[in-house]
């Protein structure tokens, strides 16, 4: 399978995110706790792709030293359950907790004719995702990010199912990484002070 990968992202965001990631890599202790929640997607996205989207999100966040997903046995209550013990443990460890969800906003898949002179058909796949984080236990919106990616690959009829699955995984992984980079960058930025508040401080 020959693959041509392209990713659509704002250059400024990508550059800033890479700088941020390099800076945070030296952090010794995590600052955030996360739980991944069910992937949101339309009927055009099959269960296998949704399952991989959750795996990709979890793997991406777990690879970042400032994020943790395990703070001890029995302290991982899900939304709708009693999360008082989880909230207390997060406060004790000085961690900010978030429920993180992937939403697959758009998903397009198209089989194209072979290139001139070629024999293999081409599979084109595009996806746009958003990653949203809400606070634990308040469930208030804390951050979000978007990512968009696509792949066009030559596929053999005999391996169509396997090649389609692999293309889908690559698209999801790349789009989610973009979205998480953007979301984490926003989370790291200091909160802006309202204009009225800044004026009061100057007068004081």
Q: Over which residues does each language-model region extend?
A:
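Positively charged n-region of N-terminal signal peptides that target proteins for export
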Residues: 1-7
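Bacterial N-terminal signal peptides
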Residues: 7-18
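A structural "domain/chain start" motif
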Residues: 17-76, 146-148, 156-157, 161, ...
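Short regulatory "switch" loops immediately downstream of catalytic or recognition motifs
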Residues: 65-69, 106-112, 153-155
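A short, well-structured beta->alpha microelement
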Residues: 70-90
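Surface-exposed short loop/turn segments
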Residues: 83-140
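Short secondary-structure boundary motifs at beta->alpha junctions and helix caps
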Residues: 118-186
